[in-house]
Amino acid sequence: MKPVQITTIKMKNFKLFSNSNKRLYSKCKTNSYDVLVVGGGIVGFATARALISRNKHLHVGLVEKENRPSVHQSGHNSGVIHAGIYYKPGTMRAKMCIEGLYKTYEYCAKNNIPHKKCGKLIVATNESQIKSLNDLYERGLENGTPDIKLINGNDIKTIEPYCNGVRAIHSPHTGIVDWAVVTKHYAADFVNLGGQITYNFKVKSFEEYKHNRALRIISEKNVLLL
């Protein structure tokens, strides 16, 4: 077997060993880190971006197994900007959904990301579904979903002529966006703030090392010592 060429990136309290042919992106000249995020989807880049923007003294890195951001779930979903109707009232998820709704539109507008506030209809197609629809409407009200209302069949046709139903919830602030594009903007923000990205780094395992004093993060050809 041909030996793997190794380079070492020194980090605060740990070292990153990586193949020399791996792509490394950074505006930051230092190679010392305080925090490393694993995973380059929207959650990973949002987390890394928030960490470095709120803690400018930290040196933050991110590793991703693919050669670009949002290859998997973040780039393959329905693309909905949710307005907070479905989640259990009082939960963190419900609260964050409403807050995220406004922040998403603000971020997309600021960064010229294509998006559309198209609205959404949740339709009861027959009388037997009305109770469930009413319950969902009450949940949306309790969550603070903005401007939702119950409408009848005629109003449904006004909004969407090809939709048939006896009653519906109209959520005018629900929208659509390509979350893969949002993720790429988060990645650019992260790098512009001094973050560092290593692509083609697939983490395979985490192992305790030397009596709980360090952690080995292992990929197919790389070892990260924490």
Predicted regions and their residues:
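Beta1/beta-strand and adjacent pyrophosphate-binding region of the FAD-binding site
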Residues: 29-43, 61
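Gly/Ala-rich phosphate-binding loop of Rossmann-like dinucleotide-binding domains
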Residues: 48, 52, 189
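Glycine-rich FAD pyrophosphate-binding loop
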Residues: 52-75
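Dinucleotide-binding Rossmann-like beta1-alpha1 core, especially the glycine-rich loop
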Residues: 79-159, 165
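Helical element adjacent to the flavin cofactor pocket in flavoenzyme catalytic cores
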Residues: 169-226
